[in-house]
């Protein structure tokens, strides 16, 4: 297919919490098959109980030779900067992360809990990832995070449709941009996404797929009611979110 699309998977859906070796074998097979079609596989991050095991399985997949593997990190967790350094050390120019705020409610002992602190921490995580030479998927609908990322990119000379000037820079992969991209949930902030795209930035839309797409979407709305208006607006007035 000529469709420029990648895959995001939740490792727990493939047995991560039941049988690690089985999950590794299954995800390895998926990564191998995806590679045949130049498809990138992203391991979604769930709550903090699964952070370490998700990172480990990503590292094990990379050690097996899968270079089309990346992970998601949540800006709100205190450990995220150390995790970024860990990934950069392990994967070098193949390091590829999606950074989001995180939707899971976490203890104040391990995570920031106020909106302002979460936004600041997420912006700092993006900055750290850029400084570590990673490919960064900036996955936020929050204007402060997006605007902060744009300033950080500009200050480092990382510009739309231009070669990444970082040394070393992340390796360019099929379907990827030069060092970064912006990512949005389907139906959320379509106006912002279109503006970024018109300015030359690579943007990507997260699209739920499969038999349980509706259940998944409803769960996301319960976990993050702040996006409910954007989704409802795109349903009632679909012309506001057209590409």
Whereabouts are the PLM-identified features?
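Positively charged, amphipathic and often flexible ligand-engagement surfaces
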Residues: 1-243
